[in-house]
Regions:
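Conserved active-site alpha-helix within GNAT-family acetyltransferase domains
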Residues: 107-111, 117-135
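Short amphipathic alpha-helix that is part of the acyltransferase structural core
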Residues: 1-59, 63-64, 71-78, 144-169
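Accessory recognition modules or surfaces
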Residues: 91, 142-144
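Conserved acetyl-CoA-binding loop-helix of GNAT-fold acetyltransferases
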Residues: 84, 90-103, 114
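Short active-site oxyanion
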Residues: 102, 106-112, 151-152
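Short coil/turn motifs at secondary-structure junctions
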Residues: 65-67, 87, 120
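Gly/Ser-rich phosphate-binding catalytic loop and adjacent alpha/beta segment
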Residues: 134-142
């Protein structure tokens, strides 16, 4: 295989299956299905990968959008899905992908980058925690104190992906 086939580059549409396999191994198999706005063939130019011997071994996804915040137009990028097979970690792949992504965002005039998750690597590249996250946990006894007669709780299925995606967006 030619050396230019390997290394850091955009995903080729024909490699979507290899990317899905990586994301399924590192995260969970349904990740591309619940993030179709990011992980899709049409967004392949914003899906940077490291390929070794024809296999996608590391990945970062980017979505770029224009938003208005209090009347100010901004170009934002959202980064996520950073994944590397365990057998390929420690080679600098994720760092190379993040560095390339940050350079592309800078060159394209992105004003603000949001990163999904936290790793020391993000901090090394200038990312910082902003805002607050809240996490609440209830045990069964505490949950039984709520009047939930007006609600139905059920498991989501593949048929719910479009509706859940619309709520997310």
């Amino acid at each position: 295989e030619a050396s230019w086939e390997n290394g850091v580059r955009s995903l080729r549409k024909s490699e979507m299956g290899s990317l899905r396999k990586l994301l399924g191994d590192v995260f969970f198999a349904e990740l591309p299905d619940i993030q179709p706005h990011a992980i899709n063939a049409e967004n392949a130019s914003n899906l940077l990968v490291v390929v070794e011997d024809g296999e996608v071994v590391s990945h970062i996804a980017t979505i770029k959008r224009h938003v208005s915040v209090l009347g100010c137009s901004l170009k934002i990028a959202s980064l996520g899905g950073v994944a590397t097979y365990k057998s390929h970690r420690g080679k600098g792949h994720a760092s190379a992908l993040l560095e390339k992504t940050m350079a592309v965002c800078r060159n394209e005039g992105v004003d603000y980058i949001m990163v999904s998750g936290y790793r020391n690597m993000y901090h090394r590249y200038g990312c910082r925690h902003v805002g607050k996250d809240w996490e609440f946990r209830l045990d069964q006894e505490q949950a039984s104190n709520f009047d939930d007669t007006g609600f139905t709780i059920s498991h989501a299925s593949k048929e719910d992906i479009d509706a859940l995606g619309a709520i997310y967006r």
